Swiss-Prot record:
SMART domains attached to this UniProt entry: RPOLD (SM00662)
The keyword Transferase belongs to this UniProt entry's keyword annotation: yes
UniProt cross-references to SUPFAM superfamilies, sorted A to Z: C-terminal domain of RNA polymerase alpha subunit, Insert subdomain of RNA polymerase alpha subunit, RBP11-like subunits of RNA polymerase
Protein name per the record: DNA-directed RNA polymerase subunit alpha
Domain commentary: The N-terminal domain is essential for RNAP assembly and basal transcription, whereas the C-terminal domain is involved in interaction with transcriptional regulators and with upstream promoter elements.
Transmembrane intervals: none
GO cellular component annotations of the record: cytoplasm; DNA-directed RNA polymerase complex
Subunit structure: Homodimer. The RNAP catalytic core consists of 2 alpha, 1 beta, 1 beta' and 1 omega subunit. When a sigma factor is associated with the core the holoenzyme is formed, which can initiate transcription.
Provenance organism: Polaromonas naphthalenivorans (strain CJ2)
Catalytic activity: RNA(n) + a ribonucleoside 5'-triphosphate = RNA(n+1) + diphosphate
Keyword Transcription: yes
Chain positions covered by the region annotation Alpha N-terminal domain (alpha-NTD): 1-231
Length: 330
């Protein structure tokens, strides 16, 4: 009897657009399409290294709820637009860039002054618009990182995060914008119970979809290799000496506000009334607990379950040492 597991022999990459691609792998043993597809999707969304603006200083601006004379957008909208700029740093981990311009007209990412080893992938992206007599002078700190990191949980050593005029941004480092996967039937000779995995990936242009899949697969291999090397004593040490609360690492998805789930206003307000501000708070609630929430009915519950399922999450999950130290519970 054949006991060796099948490995994919056919890999096909189909370009669906400038930053979108469909990657097809087959054949897999039955069930392995979902096993590997979900794992790759989670890694692609949460663990890819990328670059993002993390801090901004604007001349004459003390906080983000300000407006600037001669600039059509307020500071909040400027920061939102700035988050849409895609950076690539070569041979460095962080950089501080300058943006200085005056005169009427739009300001795009191309107006940011960059050294030779910093690349802006979408130079036509509009950051703000100046009116007659308007001018802007700002400093932008760009760092590398993984996933999504809220500004209020990042650490700054001895430097105070409350420095006047220094605006700390929530940073979405991941170059992967969307990932979905489907599992179809595959056939090898007389066997018809095999899986074909189809991954559809969209990136921000900083990496190609193929490179993203390679990088995510490498991360999985490196993580799983540890299990193949486990020894009894080492495993016991891990069990008897759990990581302290301060060093516990959480999936960056769990640190995102529930507002990013794009729920209806009714559902979102019900969650906030129950002090559920982050996705990590939400997934620890059970269906029965949520149904006891005033004004949250079965329709809203189904909406929440569907949105979580699209991100590979469910209700009733348990997280050790939640919430992480420094998380703003508002």
């Amino acid at each position: 009897m054949q006991t060796n597991l099948l490995k994919p022999k056919t890999i096909n990459v189909e370009q669906l657009g400038a930053n979108r691609a469909k990657v097809t792998l087959e054949p897999f043993e039955r069930g392995y399409g979902h096993t590997l597809g979900n794992a790759l999707r989670r890694v692609l969304l949460s663990s890819m290294v990328g670059h993002a603006a993390t801090e901004v200083t604007i001349a004459g601006v003390l906080h983000e709820y300000s407006s600037i004379d001669g600039v059509q957008e307020d500071v909040v909208n400027i920061l939102l637009n700035l988050k849409g700029v895609v950076f690539k740093l070569h041979n460095r981990d962080e950089v501080t860039l300058s943006l200085r311009k005056d005169g009427e007209g739009p300001i795009t990412a191309a107006d940011i002054q960059t050294p030779h080893d910093v690349e802006i992938v979408n130079p036509d992206h509009v950051i703000m618009n100046l009116s007659h007599g308007g001018k802007i002078d700002m400093q932008i700190k760009v760092e590398n990182g993984r996933g999504y990191v809220p500004g209020n949980v990042r650490r700054y050593g001895d430097e105070s995060p409350k420095s006047i005029g220094r605006i700390v941004l929530d940073a979405s480092f991941s170059p992967v914008k969307r990932v979905s996967y489907t599992v179809e039937s595959a056939r090898v000779e007389q066997r018809t119970d095999l899986d074909k995995l189809v991954l559809e990936i969209e990136t921000n242009g900083a990496v190609t979809a193929e490179d993203a899949v390679r990088a995510s697969a490498k991360i999985l291999v490196e993580q799983l290799a540890v299990f193949a090397q486990l020894e009894g004593n080492e495993l016991g040490a891990i069990i008897n000496d759990p990581a302290p609360r301060s060093s516990q690492q959480f999936d960056p998805i769990l640190l995102r506000p529930v507002d990013e789930l794009e729920l209806t206003v009714r559902s979102a307000n019900c969650l906030k009334a129950e002090n559920i501000y982050y996705i990590g708070d939400l997934i620890q609630r059970t269906e029965n607990e949520l149904l006891k929430t005033p004004n949250l009915g079965r329709k809203s519950l189904n909406e929440i379950k569907e949105v979580l399922a699209s991100r590979g999450l469910t209700l009733g999950m348990r997280l050790e040492s939640w919430p992480p130290a420094g998380l703003d519970k508002r």
